[in-house]
């Protein structure tokens, strides 16, 4: 790896690739050995190679940090991780908070520029602190690529519904008449009309349940004619009828991957911020690392980000947690560094 760039944003030689602006400046000790420090020859700032990443001032091996993050997205709670890995609970909590912040920045920077042709949205009910403090997790999925582009945590209100659709459409490339399907929640129709107007096909699928079984399915075409919906379904590679099956399957994936969403346990989040950060880790893992079985082409199994053209290979947590270092090197040395970790250069 090339030497890192100076993290000082006001340094005059920060992006000067032709000059030797960074020099080795000794080592510092950690529990897993010693780490290299650097010194900027222009502004005299001293720093380590992990400055600004999830590994900054980490006293343990990076592999252990990655293992904790991997366990957290497989439905393992913090107490179980602490017992299995022999790490203090507070350390596990602090690491996951740090990983969540890193994944949030990674998602905000790289989940942009995808095509939005068929969209489904839904919400999950859970609670934070106590059962009386109910919150809802709004999520959307791009059906063709299985990409999970956006999520909002909060009350089941019009503002949060509007925020979900605004975020998904602001991140996407413009496309004519996307097919949007949701359930019968009252604010979905208003939010779709506010964000995209009549330039889409929007339908609601309303399921009536009795004794926990679906006894009736009603389809309402809110925006668009019957012929337009039939044409859109013929062009779709995944949907034969109007449905919410894909977003409901994503909801199941979230409940399996997030210990905070497991029913009838004591693993609920104590604060809303904890739930949001854990969901950012899961979203990053789902989009960029975990191969999706529905995206198998021959011997190749792709991630949703690969299918959407946002990455050219599966990313590991190591590459995701070090993405800021690669980003700084991109500005200094060019495209090759970012391509090396599998991200599309135009979004790095």
Give names to the regions the model predicted.
Residues 1-348:
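Residue-level recognition of single "structural anchor" positions
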């Amino acid at each position: 790896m090339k030497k890192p760039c100076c993290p000082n944003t006001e340094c005059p030689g920060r992006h000067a690739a032709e000059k030797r602006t960074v020099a080795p400046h000794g080592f510092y000790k950690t529990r897993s050995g010693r780490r290299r420090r650097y010194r900027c020859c222009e502004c005299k700032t001293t720093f380590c190679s992990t400055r600004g990443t999830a590994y900054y001032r980490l006293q343990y091996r990076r592999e252990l940090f990655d293992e904790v993050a991997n366990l957290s997205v497989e439905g393992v709670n913090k107490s179980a991780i602490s017992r299995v890995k022999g790490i203090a609970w507070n350390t596990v909590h602090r690491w996951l908070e740090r990983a969540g912040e890193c994944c949030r920045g990674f998602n905000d920077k790289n989940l942009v520029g995808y095509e939005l042709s068929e969209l489904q949205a839904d919400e999950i009910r859970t609670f934070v602190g106590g059962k009386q403090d109910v919150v809802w997790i709004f999520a959307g999925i791009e059906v063709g690529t299985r990409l999970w582009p956006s999520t909002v945590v909060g009350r089941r209100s019009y503002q949060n519904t509007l925020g979900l659709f605004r975020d998904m459409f602001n991140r996407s490339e413009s496309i004519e008449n996307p097919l949007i399907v949701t359930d019968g929640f009252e604010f979905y129709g208003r939010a779709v009309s506010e964000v995209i107007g009549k330039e889409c096909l929007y339908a609601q699928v309303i399921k009536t349940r009795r004794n926990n079984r679906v006894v009736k399915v009603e389809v309402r075409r809110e925006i668009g004619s019957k012929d337009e919906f039939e044409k859109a379904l013929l062009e779709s590679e995944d949907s034969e009828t109007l449905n919410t099956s894909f977003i409901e399957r994503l909801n199941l994936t979230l409940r399996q991957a997030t210990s905070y969403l497991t029913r009838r346990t004591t693993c609920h989040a104590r604060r809303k911020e904890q739930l949001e950060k854990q969901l950012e880790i899961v979203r990053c893992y789902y989009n960029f690392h975990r191969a999706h079985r529905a995206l198998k082409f021959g011997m190749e199994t792709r991630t949703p980000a690969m299918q959407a053209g946002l990455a050219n290979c599966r990313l590991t947590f190591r590459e995701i947690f070090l993405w800021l270092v690669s980003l700084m090197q991109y500005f200094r040395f060019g495209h090759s560094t970012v391509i090396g970790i599998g991200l599309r250069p135009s979004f790095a």
